[in-house]
């Protein structure tokens, strides 16, 4: 099973979403959180933070302790169905400037309702719902 890790990033009541380019992703153009594959020797949180920097240029973040949410899904690769596990963490930042990687074509800092509408996949909306519930009660 493929494994990736990502970050639900909050800044002053808004959440960051990235729009994938059609080049880097089979489902090109979809809106999601910063995330990516684990490199050998990395922890889940190290992966999530590295991917955040690579995909957004945002380095100054504070991880919110105690939140870890996982989604599992399958996607087609050739004739195969590939299983994928994605682990998400919450972080906060005061930075709002985003420098996109080649994997993305757009970004938005959105209020929670707008983020729910913009996210492409239901499982990402559930992660956001869980993250908001945890964050506002922390």
Give the location of each predicted region.
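Short aromatic/basic micro-patch
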Residues: 32, 83, 109
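The catalytic Nudix box helix
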Residues: 33-67
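Active-site segment of metal-dependent pyrophosphate-handling enzymes
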Residues: 57-96
């Amino acid at each position: 099973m493929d494994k990736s890790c990502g970050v639900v990033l909050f800044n002053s009541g808004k959440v960051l979403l990235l729009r994938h380019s059609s080049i880097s992703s089979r489902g090109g153009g979809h809106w999601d959180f910063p995330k990516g594959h684990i490199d050998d020797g990395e922890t889940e949180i190290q992966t999530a933070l590295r991917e955040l920097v690579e995909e957004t240029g945002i380095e100054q973040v504070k991880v919110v302790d105690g939140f870890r949410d996982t989604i599992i899904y399958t996607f087609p690769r050739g004739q195969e169905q590939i299983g994928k596990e994605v682990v998400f963490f919450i972080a906060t930042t005061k930075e709002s400037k985003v420098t996109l990687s080649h994997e993305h074509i757009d970004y938005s800092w959105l209020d929670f309702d707008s983020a729910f509408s913009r996210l492409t996949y239901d499982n990402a909306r559930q992660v956001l719902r869980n993250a908001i519930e945890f964050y506002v009660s922390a």
